[in-house]
Amino acid sequence: MLSFVDTRTLLLLAVTSCLATCQYLQSGSVRKGPTGDRGPRGQRGPAGPRGRDGVDGPMGPPGPPGSPGPPGSPAPPGLTGNFAAQYSDKGVSSGPGPMGLMGPRGPPGAVGAPGPQGFQGPAGEPGEPGQTGPAGPRGPAGSPGKAGEDGHPGKPGRPGERGVVGPQGARGFPGTPGLPGFKGVKGHSGMDGLKGQPGAQGVKGEPGAPGENGTPGQAGARGLPGERGRVGAPGPAGARGSDGSVGPVGPAGPIGSAGPPGFPGAPGPKGELGPVGNPGPAGPAGPRGEVGLPGLSGPVGPPGNPGTNGLTGAKGATGLPGVAGAPGLPGPRGIPGPAGAAGATGARGLVGEPGPAGSKGESGNKGEPGSVGAQGPPGPSGEEGKRGSPGEAGSAGPAGPPGLRGSPGSRGLPGADGRAGVMGPPGNRGSTGPAGIRGPNGDAGRPGEPGLMGPRGLPGSPGNVGPSGKEGPVGLPGIDGRPGPIGPAGPRGEAGNIGFPGPKGPSGDPGKPGERGHPGLAGARGAPGPDGNNGAQGPPGPQGVQGGKGEQGPAGPPGFQGLPGPSGTTGEVGKPGERGLPGEFGLPGPAGPRGERGTPGESGAAGPSGPIGSRGPSGAPGPDGNKGEAGAVGAPGSAGASGPGGLPGERGAAGIPGGKGEKGETGLRGDTGNTGRDGARGIPGAVGAPGPAGASGDRGEAGAAGPSGPAGPRGSPGERGEVGPAGPNGFAGPAGAAGQPGAKGEKGTKGPKGENGIVGPTGSVGAAGPSGPNGPPGPVGSRGDGGPPGMTGFPGAAGRTGPPGPSGIAGPPGPPGAAGKEGIRGPRGDQGPVGRTGETGASGPPGFVGEKGPSGEPGTAGAPGTAGPQGLLGAPGILGLPGSRGERGLPGIAGALGEPGPLGISGPPGARGPPGAVGSPGVNGAPGEAGRDGNPGSDGPPGRDGQPGHKGERGYPGSIGPTGAAGAPGPHGSVGPAGKHGNRGEPGPAGSVGPVGAVGPRGPSGPQGIRGDKGEPGDKGHRGLPGLKGYSGLQGLPGLAGLHGDQGAPGPVGPAGPRGPAGPSGPVGKDGRSGQPGPVGPAGVRGSQGSQGPAGPPGPPGPPGPPGVSGGGYDFGFEGDFYRADQPRSQPSLRPKDYEVDATLKSLNNQIETLLTPEGSRKNPARTCRDLRLSHPEWNSDYYWIDPNQGCTMDAIKVYCDFSTGETCIQAQPVNTPAKNSYSRAQANKHVWLGETINGGSQFEYNVEGVSSKEMATQLAFMRLLANRASQNITYHCKNSIAYLDEETGSLNKAVLLQGSNDVELVAEGNSRFTYSVLVDGCSKKTNEWGKTIIEYKTNKPSRLPFLDIAPLDIGGADQEFRVEVGPVCFK
């Protein structure tokens, strides 16, 4: 049956089945419902369709030769098999089907008895190759073969005996930190010191004991951050923390050494018959043989006209299965399959003993910042910080309490004149006094208003020349001038670097056919040609006359061993032959099975040292080495998880004060300390905002009275004078009530740091703080000990065919094997020379129907027939377990648009949710419950078949899929010997599902049974994981009406809103046993969370549901009585569902193809160029997209793939640096780094557009891991600057330095691992012309590339210039 199923379907379904099985194992057992009673026997079905052609009957006795009949008309084409091989309960037939069509013409009949001795005929055609002769004697030893390629590295040898103690080794690398010691016992608290008496004010004394903390003042505004202090000296290395919790899975480690070979697999299935090989070259003509034994019947005459058809033979019994063929040759090694899914995390292994100190690794990349260390002790006083910018004015604080009354101030200045008193009553008129003295001049009157503008004055005389002004600031650059005329052509530039090879050009047009040559001279007569191969077997000739027995001819020489012929049909058992003479010693047979292990041989001489093998597994820990010297302090490790509390340790001595730590976070408020001494006076703060007005001061004391003058005459009141100048301030009045605090003044400059106070007693340990957030993933840890072996995984998918492995070393010749079985029949030989035509025999009488001859050789394959109609939909397969959640597949190819279905009933609008922030895309949510079925859309037209895709890799075996279209009929197999007809056995207990048996004889139809009781509803199943989103199916045909089932348990409420009660169930199929619940359908779009509404009224009845699946669940048994036979070709049997299945399979196939064969595009990048070359060997070198770190393709990078060398090349950005002339800070005889010093810290970068430098660094790190070789070149363009060899001195002292990626310096001479080579050196002498030197560095340590910087030495002169051109870095 399987031969009719589309192989792709099986592969895809196999994957689904395997995943489902895994999921089933994980999800725990599912309670299976009780098996229902067996239903009654169904009614007698309608007459089945026509049965298949019966098997040919046994051979009849040979008939007499028939008279030649007239030529028959061409036979109609046979029916195309549309075998749907399905079990059916309905296939009870009322008897044998109608007689089948006439079968194909049978093979020629058996050869008749030998006729009488004929005349000596002409030499017959060469006979078929004889059976394989006995093995010849052992030949002489062949010449030694070429040395085989190196074999795979052997397993690591056993450890040798301990050698003599060597000399004192070099200083070892620092060992790993020891395990943490137990915590020391807490020491006794020291006695509190006595408080010192205050001394006389003198030189500032040592700081006193800290005073008690004062009451906490109001929190000051946060000061501006000071400048970052200098990095303190590194503290001593901390004790090793306890082992942290298991970190996230690190990136895949380097590929380990090859494991030991697995156990031999079970013998594979018999391979298909290989294609007929091309005939081998003809061997040299042998010597003419002696006269052979009398030949068989003479040359076959032309076949007679076909006889009349014989009677149809009785149906033969099914033949016994044939003998299993010999196992096929092992196929070539498959290409490594994709990496299997990560196994479950093994249990944590025990900590192994410390291994011996490893060799020093290369400097690692800079690690992520460690977690914040504990706060160090206060550092020494820093330098005075810069004055901060003034802060914003603070809000006014509350009014403070009234201050104490101040002591009386010093005597104040006289107060201002008091206000005039109230006017007294008018006095009596006095007597006229004498004339007074002229009074002083009155106060100047108020200035008059400005007069009108006077007439313009005459121009003044010119002034003296003023001093020359200061030079003004440089003006802004002027507008660009017009472009100047085109200058003369410059000298021809130097040749650029060799570019990447261009893509391969298209094939040229085929050349014109040449003219016909002159006919050649006739050649000399050739040697006799070799015997031709057998001609095709002719039809049997007429029965010859009985010949007389010829004389025994001499034995001919043994012929060449013929090729094994194809397997012939089973002949009748021959009579036992006479015992033959013992044969000569045969040729060496094939290697026998592996013998038992021999005793160990003597130790051989030491061979030459072999190549370095791949790293072996870790050996047992060696003895402890001598203690190495203390290593350099390592970088702080990331904080480990808290270990269990240790025993208290002894009190340690006071440590040396550490360097100043970085500013820690604000600690919790401490207890109140003792009052400290006054600090040094700070710099006065800025003047605050004016306070509120004070209360009026007391009146000042009256001044001393002056001598009274004579009374003057009463003057008339003058005009009111202007306000006089303010009088002097009066004495200070008493303190007014405290005003509102002024606005906060600007922050004063930071005072000098006070001296450190004495460290207070250690506070009690605070409660453990909450766990901080997880730090960033630490750097990749060293490789952990191997976990325990995981459970045996499921068989991986067969890998793609790998390249053939290297030839192994030729083994010793095996012992002679037993004589091989008779070989299969060799391929048909070339046609022999045409024999002379025999005379036409007389027409014999018509023969009886002959026994069926053996099957003829299969004819050449006919032209493919037209595709048969779609087979019937197969019976539903076993319900698969829900598959595990697959990774999100790539978007499938858009299917053809179906016609839109009618609109469904619109749901009630949900409440508007608040707008959420745009989140990162979440993982697919759990699937909601399936919504109600919409009205069925009209069927869309089926799409045309797409082009066949590339062949995918072999998938996991799938569950049985729907029956595919019938394949073309295979060639007739050879008929085996007829078996005896067995008696009908008793019915046995139900066994496990076996393979499909041969068709049994039809039994009589039973009476119709009674309808069975309704089955119990099954238990509610676990919610399945979401499957791949299927294509929306077309509405199925309605099933036969059944009884309504009980209401199932309600599913979990989906998030999409209130769901009404389920509508009435549609008609169901015939009741079967309750099956396992099916997988949940595709998830709908997740709606916003609706509030739980009241249950709505029952909806209208839905459309009829699709037919129910056949019951049986996992109690699947083949209980059908018969196969359902072929459907007639004309009946339309293609159901609409088949289109959906076919489209889904095509989509899955395309997605898997895409995963397995990357295209090098941005959406489907490869991992490296090597993967692209393996997937598309016909592609040319060009730019492609790759994604070395896999995962999301958003950070894929565009690289140049050089398929001729297998390299992945990444360009620097930018490639050229601008030319640099004299660099003023260049010191004599000192290299200057271009990026770090001259360009202000910008090193060479290798960015790709759209990818950040961090992402690019990650991709480069993965490229280094994936490659085992790297190379790069850099071109130094110079003018009067030496780049490598100084031709004047012949030294390399002025050669440039290069900085690699791991901070290694690459030099011109020295250690060969770190020296670069020079391809072109045009900068060896100073010629006032531009030249260039091309430097190349190749390494098998990809971590050293790409170049990050270059440091020339010979620069800085007024006539010196240089620039750099960075070539691409290529990984392989």
Curated annotation (Swiss-Prot):
Residues carrying covalently attached carbohydrate according to the record: K183, N1273
GO CC terms, sorted: collagen trimer; collagen type I trimer; collagen-containing extracellular matrix; extracellular space
Binding site residues for Ca(2+): D1187, N1189, Q1190, C1192, D1195
Biased composition (Low complexity): 95-146, 231-260, 285-299, 306-327, 336-351, 390-416, 476-495, 519-537, 600-639, 681-716, 725-743, 755-771, 792-801, 855-882, 905-927, 957-978, 987-1007
Gene Ontology terms for molecular function: extracellular matrix structural constituent; identical protein binding; metal ion binding; platelet-derived growth factor binding; protease binding; protein-macromolecule adaptor activity; SMAD binding
Biased composition (Basic and acidic residues): 147-161, 744-753, 1011-1022
Domain Fibrillar collagen NC1 residue range list: 1139-1372
Region (Disordered): 28-1135
Maturation-removed propeptide residues: 23-85, 1126-1372
Subcellular compartments: Secreted, Extracellular space, Extracellular matrix
Biased segments, Pro residues type: 59-77, 1095-1107
Protein name per Swiss-Prot or TrEMBL: Collagen alpha-2(I) chain
Species annotation: Mus musculus (Mouse)
Highest classification ranks of the organism: Eukaryota, Metazoa, Chordata, Craniata, Vertebrata
